[in-house]
């Protein structure tokens, strides 16, 4: 009987340990994007112009501002109710991403960040939105 209890305790402790490590690893990688290599060097095919930036600004106001805020700091009215941190588009970390990486993130989404393929179905509109996001650098 004692041998059974020891085995049961050992198995229980092992399961608890595995669960604890998986929770820690999941928490550490929650904000990590797995971006395919082709997007890391992908260039924006839409020429930057007053029109593309203005169109991007309109799309931002409609689809992004509620979470990312007026200035793109990640402090929009919906941000406080989310259990994740919204990206700060003015940050060096965000601005260091390639246009292709940003395009992938907004197109595919992850977790609380929705995919914008259906909400902004035209690729060129999403590329124009990236031009607008670039105007937020260092604000």
Regions found by a protein language model. Give the residues of each.
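Bacterial N-terminal signal peptides
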Residues: 11-20
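C-terminal capping alpha-helices of c-type cytochrome domains
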Residues: 105-112, 118-139
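N-terminal secretory signal peptides that target proteins for export/translocation
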Residues: 1-6
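Electrostatic cytochrome c docking/interface patches
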Residues: 29-59
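Electron-transfer interface patches adjacent to heme c in soluble/periplasmic c-type cytochromes
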Residues: 86-100, 116-126
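Sequence/structural segment immediately N-terminal to covalent heme-attachment motifs in c-type
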Residues: 49-73, 79, 108
